[in-house]
């Protein structure tokens, strides 16, 4: 395995050389690369069916292995490969469980001889080990997708430093694989809803009442392409829980931001049309814009210089706030009443720092801050989510009845006693209950908390079961403190302490068009929230913040990693931060990074009390990234580096051992197969054939973001798959030797 740690360290290109680490499209679409100067030397490789059978059965060949007689080793070894035959041999020999992946769990010999390009296929060199063979499977799968029958493959793509390889895949492939835009080019697929369980599922899009240009655009698409059966609906100006409920009979995609562009029409010449602003989805099966996933993804996009995508997602968020009143859980009709953890101010400020040299940068930031102000008032401190006694906020989305996006059978065990009580069939009861014809306060309470859990982004966890809407959570109130301080600082430093409220962002706020906002107002809000949280949520003895139950007027005891969000937001005092690091952090730190919650808080599990995915023993990318950033904010650099190293090591090890896998969440207590998750939703990102195309959005981001946290020595150690205890022991020995040399 190469020990280089940066793309610049890869071998240089010669005059006849191509980019060894080019993206797959560039690498496999080039005829010259794969047929050029070797084209007249490949006849030796055209083997009889007998030799192909020998390859397939892995029998000894009458040829010697020309392992070290390459004529161009200084340029790097290359293999001359017949794609289909080699792929067939590789799968037959190495993919012993038949899942189109080569992992440490396959029992093949883990060695495959390949013909060398320098010998025109006469000599061979053995490719060995799970990592190289799984990379070979991935490369051959890609080559086949690009229509190649024969390729010249650089060995460097097979033994590439895994940190470099995963970083490269994220930058060159995964982000593109997860990028969507909603317009005529994608509407047929994007507007189909896998959760449409009605009798007539069809593509459907809802347009905000004020977006007449989009409405006309999609109506024309429907007229031009009747075969796709696109249903275009205009939303009412005011959207109530009753309207959201009734829309469940016709679920659909919600329109997002577009831009006007010019394109060439073969008949009309240059015409103006609409094009959707792009956004990144969490995983490959999604086609809608998501809430806090988008913020987490933006952290990685900015590292990879994809400012265009991060900026477009901010603009999409502003569009959602202006037209739907909130940043939605996701842009589907059944999510119109539900938001997700708010990160808009930090996201916009990070993008602004990258584009502030551009002429429209300040206007971009102005609209983003105004949208955040509207969201702050109309959503998070609005009547539904604000506890007036404490002044703290909770997750509590609007909604009536049974959440429609779940499988119809999901709530059978909850509803069965009520169905029996009323002597009704399942569907009959759900319809009557949803429309208020049956009153069941206990059931209302259950679904209020269920919707709140989904809005929290932490669905599901025993932390929230049956109580979520009663809680002022440490995570939400830390985020709102960050909104307050971000808005205050931005108004003061960039808008001369005067920000004028325009009409489009006044709805749901206490402001009128033309009102001038100053930083002092937002400073007071932040100070008041900080004082209240210190009083109600801080536990001096435990050295942590806890959720506060304002119904029962008591502090909760569930230990959650979101206590570290107080560092990310700058809410914790220096002493509180030190206490959290000293007393709290050790409770969450595991082999692979931070746990979402502690084992003692989760409690015993069994058949009647199964695992929940946001509890022990699982770790999630958002918790890691916010913790690293928060620790660095308070100068706990060593702790941030250690946690980042553990998370990155776990991801890299699974990537190497399990055919390039990158998944939604990990069991941070499992050293061998942390991507295996035994929780209610399983794990996304596992079921690919041959090669992973997208990874998972916020894990991709955490990887490239985390590599900015660790130092160069750590990055080199990650490339050689050095576990953290081994790494830190070696560092300590080096330090001891250095001290001894000084004496």
From Swiss-Prot:
It comes from the Eukaryota. Keywords: Calcium, Cytoplasm, Glycosidase, Hydrolase, Metal-binding. Belongs to the glycosyl hydrolase 37 family. The lineage of its organism: Eukaryota, Fungi, Dikarya, Ascomycota, Pezizomycotina. InterPro entries: 6-hairpin_glycosidase_sf, 6hp_glycosidase-like_sf, Glyco_hydro_37, Glyco_hydro_37_CS, Trehalase_Ca-bd. One of its GO terms (cellular component) is alpha,alpha-trehalose-phosphate synthase complex (UDP-forming). GO terms for molecular function: alpha,alpha-trehalase activity; calcium ion binding; trehalase activity. Hydrolyzes intracellular trehalose to glucose. The active site is at 459 (proton donor/acceptor), 664 (proton donor/acceptor). It comes from Beauveria bassiana (strain ARSEF 2860) (White muscardine disease fungus). Transmembrane segments: none annotated. It is found in: Cytoplasm. Ca(2+) binds at residues 95, 97, 99, 101, 106. Gene3D superfamilies: 1.50.10.10. Optimum pH is 7.0 at 55 degrees Celsius. Substrate binds at residues 285, 292-293, 329, 338-340, 405, 454, 457. GO terms for biological process: ascospore formation; trehalose catabolic process. This is Cytosolic neutral trehalase. It holds the Pfam family Trehalase_Ca-bi. Optimum temperature is 55 degrees Celsius at pH 7.0. Its cofactor is Ca(2+). Pathway: Carbohydrate degradation. It catalyses: alpha,alpha-trehalose + H2O = alpha-D-glucose + beta-D-glucose.
